């Protein structure tokens, strides 16, 4: 007789990084719902306090970064970059909670890379037109077609593997410190967590989001035209 797999069996059979991804996604969704409820009651004439100040700082900073790289069309790209930044930073620092960082799994980072790659291609096709976009692969000479294709296809792997390697290395080093030093790790662990989880996690989030914005910017036409508005 076949044994019916329960949700508990399914969940425990998942890898630690996938379990962390599920847990953090649920937590972020709950936090977003709570913040959304708070924002519904917030009036723009009110003096910002608490989480509102943090949100204004975060969204304002990402908007400024996107605007400096992309220009006028930044308004439709910034929400994706903001969502990406929040998930990446929370995932990168999840080691502070004793979790396996989701970004220490190549499946997670490559998925993020493929998502970004899809948006990059959609942006190029939407802004340039399908024929003009495809023509770009044979410029300045058709002989460059293989090189251009390889460079384009390498984008999600470049983004995903860079993030994966940096976060995994930090997790491995922290694991070695705890296994070798035992209780003595409590002396050096705070400083190492500060570097590998917080500092390195922030830097990798910044690098991923900056590269994402730059790749998207590279698909936009040179003219200073907000093509998102003209195509709505």
Model-derived regions, located:
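Selective transmembrane helix interface/packing segments
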Residues: 1-232
